[in-house]
């Protein structure tokens, strides 16, 4: 344990879903601090982490050292009880450089055996670019696992749509989207799962309205025009 885990991906590629699955798999012996608003100073971030973990500290302190010491004592006590501590920061691409440096310093909190704090940074691709800058070299070197969520290709889009429909209760082997429709969906959404969900939902509604048993390219184009407007359609035809 310890160090940093990086999860990066464009908006809509499934970071929140992966995050949720990860949280569900954390053992009961884990204490978790989640920071969803990264527009914080270093002091505010440490205070928020302490609040999340129910750590006592002088509430009006302006001292980073006081907050770090309080966190360190908590981490040591947790370690002695056999518990793990995880700090998860979402939208981490918005963190200022001085805040990222303060977060790096938290990974210095360790025993002779191991790091006391596991930090998970979640953000858009700009986060990866930011961490590659020279001034964050030391933090970048402490990342022990990197995951980059990519858009789905056509085969993955087919499998994804099938899976979503089966989870919703559709019998296996039944296809509500013909191949041309799936190709169109992949092109129009650029393989972004969140957009695939929106477009499929609208196309299925259109098929229901026309009493059709299967979605074709025409229905997808019509649905895309309703949810995305004309710009994405013309962009898709030019691809």
Residue ranges and their predicted role:
Residues 1-21:
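Walker A/P-loop nucleotide-binding motif
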Residues 63-72, 84, 160, 173-188:
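Short conserved motifs of the RecA-like P-loop NTPase core
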